[in-house]
Amino acid sequence: LLFLFSSAYSRGVFRRDTHKSEVAHRFKDLGEEHFKGLVLVAFSQYLQQCPFEEHVKLVNEVTEFAKTCVADESAENCDKSLHTLFGDKLCTVATLRETYGEMADCCAKQEPERNECFLQHKDDNPNLPPLVRPEVDVMCTAFHDNEATFLKKYLYEVARRHPYFYAPELLFFAARYKAAFAECCQAADKAACLLPKLDELRDEGKASSAKQRLKCASLQKFGDRAFKAWAVARLSQKFPKAEFAEVSKLVTDLTKVHTECCHGDLLECADDRADLAKYMCENQDSISSKLKECCDKPLLEKSHCLAEVENDEMPADLPSLAADYVESKDVCKNYAEAKDVFLGMFLYEYARRHPDYSVMLLLRLAKAYEATLEKCCAAADPHECYAKVFDEFQPLVEEPQNLVKQNCELFEQLGEYKFQNALLVRYTKKVPQVSTPTLVEVSRNLGKVGAKCCKLPEAKRMPCAEDYLSVVLNRLCVLHEKTPVSEKVTKCCTESLVNRRPCFSALELDEAYVPKAFNAETFTFHADMCTLSEKEKQVKKQTALVELVKHKPKATKEQLKGVMDNFAAFVEKCCKADDKEACFAEEGPKFVAASQAALA
């Protein structure tokens, strides 16, 4: 049990050293198809601007090399580490300096510094054009003409836009993408069959990318202790019947898998993830009764299914926690003997009893418990000091409960679009220095929490909502870190992972902010507004709303609502006009003048 939070222990350490050639070992374990897919993802995540053909060429060279090593492990260079092999390969790209600038300096470094340097240059917001979906017939033709290239292009386009996408999971998405085309390109109505499937994959993919980004941020910014604590809480909720030792083993293995993927070690990560799935399926009886249906599936589907599996039923006769963690006279002795194990067990016991709490709340409770023990175990009468520790949890529990209740009520009342607008106003007032596109993206996603979580039963609302908000706010933190503009954002993002959401919730109107000068150009619109999709229209209107609040941070709800209603009416009027552009040219300045007057 002492191994729970010690990173030295890991089953991977033991099998690693027996292979003369790491690249041959991974090729044999993963098979050619997965090997090639993962190498393509790795290269696309590092060199996000390189053309597709360049990457395919690199992947083919690495694959041919791996095959020579499989044939003879002692062949030249086969004993080199994967980082050395891949890094050397990346550094052969001729246009490295002109395309990536200072990233080319990484090539002068030795491993492991070189790989760290490449990782630091991954761009979370790469300047790439949005993906445009071709006509269905065009896609089906491309799929039939060259299925392999079609699927590689999918891996490449997603990986370069999402440099931290969980690689083995991206292979699963690609398999579903392939299945959708194989089925729908045969269908009578291709579009009706295919488009909903592609929309679903796109939305799920974006969600998967964002969830993984939070895992990588936890590991990179807060260390593996933070990730392990998160994993103990989550797995204890999922597997309440499993023993603590079993949960600890899974946490250790899961931490290794994610550390590897977040570190760009995609072959090791995928191999270890497959081992973990195998282990879980061989030991279902001591983990969870819910794993059965996952374990019959093929590998990629199996791993995905295990990751998403629903919570097992709680054992019926769990005793009260107070006996061991409050009433016992040995609390301080047990804590002092092995602090992290004792806290890990506390977190496990609390989490398995509370599938209705968010993981972040459970971690806050464990943190509060730790702080109380640190204080009380040094006191004259420790037991007297910590006797009321569970009462101190109450406000911590009520805060997210009330937050979810209030925001779900607001969502029910307003609907998604107007709920997003309320959040846009709220967040622009808190952190007006943040760029408008980032505020729009983050607030739109925060607003999606309503449709995602508010219709769930009470017991599932908080874990759904708060853990989703943590994922969305991490996106704000990641974008803000690239171009920091607000000390408040930096403070909320870096001080504490588990308190990020309460930190943002607690921010008030930024009094120090100097309002942005009014710029008529920002509020000038043209006839192209009329041909936009509903979503694009919303983004345009929401962009204007953010700019209004930046110009008048103290505007009231009523004032802003008046201006937005006028805006909608003005756009609708001009889009119905015979000469649309003339209408925008004439009505636009009137709208701007009326808005300024309304906000004066």
Swiss-Prot record:
Phosphothreonine modified-residue sites: T99, T436, T438
- Which GO CC annotations does the UniProt entry carry? cytoplasm; extracellular space; protein-containing complex
Tell me the compartments it is located in: Secreted
In this UniProt entry, the residues modified to N6-methyllysine are K550
Which GO molecular function terms does the record list?
A: DNA binding; enterobactin binding; fatty acid binding; metal ion binding; pyridoxal phosphate binding; toxic substance binding
Residue numbers carrying N6-succinyllysine: K221, K452, K535, K580
Q: Where does Cu cation bind?
A: H19
Q: Which residues form the Albumin domain?
A: 11-202, 203-395, 396-593
| Positions of the pro-segment in this chain | 11-16
Q: Record's superkingdom? A: Eukaryota
Q: Which UniProt keywords apply?
A: Calcium, Cleavage on pair of basic residues, Copper, Disulfide bond, Lipid-binding, Metal-binding, Methylation, Phosphoprotein, Repeat, Secreted, Signal, Zinc
Q: Which Pfam families match?
A: Serum_albumin
Give the principal location in a single coarse category. secreted
- The cysteines covalently paired via disulfide bonds are C69-C78, C91-C107, C106-C117, C140-C185, C184-C193, C216-C262, C261-C269, C281-C295, C294-C305, C332-C377, C376-C385, C408-C454, C453-C464, C477-C493, C492-C503, C530-C575, C574-C583
Listed CDD domains: ALBUMIN
Amino-acid positions noted as binding Ca(2+) 2 in the UniProt annotation, renumbered to this chain: D29, D271, D275
The post-translation modification note in this UniProt entry reads:
Phosphorylated by FAM20C in the extracellular medium.
List every position bearing Phosphoserine.
Answer: S21, S74, S81, S289, S435, S505
List this protein's GO terms for biological process: cellular response to calcium ion starvation; cellular response to starvation; negative regulation of mitochondrial depolarization
The record's comment on protein family reads:
Belongs to the ALB/AFP/VDB family.
What PANTHER family does UniProt report for this protein, alphabetically? ALBUMIN, SERUM ALBUMIN-RELATED
The task this protein performs is described as: Binds water, Ca(2+), Na(+), K(+), fatty acids, hormones, bilirubin and drugs. Its main function is the regulation of the colloidal osmotic pressure of blood. Major zinc transporter in plasma, typically binds about 80% of all plasma zinc. Major calcium and magnesium transporter in plasma, binds approximately 45% of circulating calcium and magnesium in plasma. Potentially has more than two calcium-binding sites and might additionally bind calcium in a non-specific manner.
Quaternary structure and partners = Interacts with FCGRT; this interaction regulates ALB homeostasis. Interacts with TASOR. In plasma, occurs in a covalently-linked complex with chromophore-bound alpha-1-microglobulin; this interaction does not prevent fatty acid binding to ALB.
Q: What is the recorded name of this protein?
A: Albumin
